[in-house]
Amino acid sequence: MKKGLTELCYGFFSTLANPTRLAIIEHLNEGPMSVTELVEALGQEQSMISHNLRPLTRCKLVKRKREGKNNVYYLNHETINPILTAVENHAEKYCEGGENCPLKKGAM
């Protein structure tokens, strides 16, 4: 393992290890959205959505573009898609669809 990789991995996975951020990623996987659309979709305060978008955009997992007066957020599919595929493949192979899978919410 390269020196410093542990720190990089920790920072990367810490950015993802948040239910609100994962929900944002899940919604953006359907297509680009504004903060207002994310607020409506997730039922959370605008400040909470903005707070959680910040680390995702800083790490370039989510990208932002200006459309008129609004910022629209979209996934960096080049990075996110392989991660989501790896998680799905791992769960299919090792969780056998069971409710006792430690990867499922509440099982840890």
Task: Annotate each PLM feature.
Residues 1-4, 8, 80-108:
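Amphipathic alpha-helical dimerization/coiled-coil segments
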Residues 4-47, 67-80:
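N-terminal helix-turn-helix DNA-binding core of bacterial DNA-binding proteins
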Residues 40, 57-58:
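Alpha-helical residues within the helix-turn-helix
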Residues 44, 49, 103-105:
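A short, surface-exposed loop/turn module that caps and links secondary-structure elements
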Residues 52:
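Residues within the DNA-recognition helix of helix-turn-helix
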